[in-house]
Structures are given as C-alpha cells and as structure tokens.
C-alpha cells in the first residue's frame, strides 16, 4: 500500500528552495538584459518581486493562477471578482491562459504595463506603514463621535 510522507514541512522547504533557485536564474537573466540595465535598484527590486511571487505561488509549480492572484489581492485589501481576475491575467499573459509565469510577472513589474501590480505592491507597503497605535485609545469629545 501507499506510504504516508510525514516530512511535509521538510519537503515543502526543499520545494521552496528549488523554486527560489529557479527564480534566481530568471533574475540573473533580467540583470544581464541590456533593456533593463538603466533601471537603478534593479537587483533590490528583483529580490522584492521574487519574495512576493514565492509567497503567492503556493503550489510551487512556477505559475500564479487565478486563485493565487485572488488570495494576493484579498490579502492586500483589494478583492476582485472572478471576471476581473480573468481579465487581469489575460492582459498580463497576452491571452495565453489562466496563469502567468515569473518572467511575465517581472516584465509586467518592470515594464510600462505594470500599473496594476505596482499599485498592488504600493498598497501593501502603505498597509505596513500604517501600524496600529499601541496603548489605550485616545479620549474623544462628544462632538467627535459619529
């Protein structure tokens, strides 16, 4: 009969390490590409994009599908309908299917058409900046109440 793999976490770690290796190779191609050589901070941007991509490529197959994109946008506080997501992926992948690869993701982030994903990452940065205040809440006057 079948054996049960009790090392799920270890296997997942290996999968993520392999994935990171593949993404690093793609990053190297972009760093060597003369088209992007004028972009300052390119290596820092590529590292940030790699981390984001790995976070949402949950199955580790190298592509972000519609459900991963949906999760990404919901986490960022900009949930989209299934139809909007399909349109977004179609625009990004040039109509080639319901997923997009890391290299397409990078071209989109570094190119002119990157408005949507840049906006997504910008929202996430803003969310980090607006940390919740600690301590007891400030007292309000009656006139300030809704």
Swiss-Prot record:
Gene assigned in the entry: AIF1
Membrane-protein topology: Peripheral membrane protein
Residue list for modification N6-acetyllysine: 10
Role description: Actin-binding protein that enhances membrane ruffling and RAC activation. Enhances the actin-bundling activity of LCP1. Binds calcium. Plays a role in RAC signaling and in phagocytosis. May play a role in macrophage activation and function. Promotes the proliferation of vascular smooth muscle cells and of T-lymphocytes. Enhances lymphocyte migration. Plays a role in vascular inflammation. Has a dual influence on glucose-induced insulin secretion: inhibition at low concentration and stimulation at high concentrations.
UniProt KW keywords: Acetylation, Actin-binding, Calcium, Cell membrane, Cell projection, Cytoplasm, Cytoskeleton, Membrane, Metal-binding, Phosphoprotein, Repeat
Gene Ontology annotations of biological process type: actin filament bundle assembly; actin filament polymerization; cellular response to type II interferon; inflammatory response; phagocytosis, engulfment; positive regulation of G1/S transition of mitotic cell cycle; positive regulation of monocyte chemotaxis; positive regulation of smooth muscle cell chemotaxis
PANTHER family per UniProt: ALLOGRAFT INFLAMMATORY FACTOR 1, ALLOGRAFT INFLAMMATORY FACTOR-1
List of residues that carry N-acetylserine: 1
One annotated Gene Ontology cellular component of this protein: cytoplasm
Main location (coarse class): cytoplasm
Tissue: Microglial cells in the central nervous system and dendritic cells and macrophages in several organs.
Name listed for the protein in its UniProt record: Allograft inflammatory factor 1
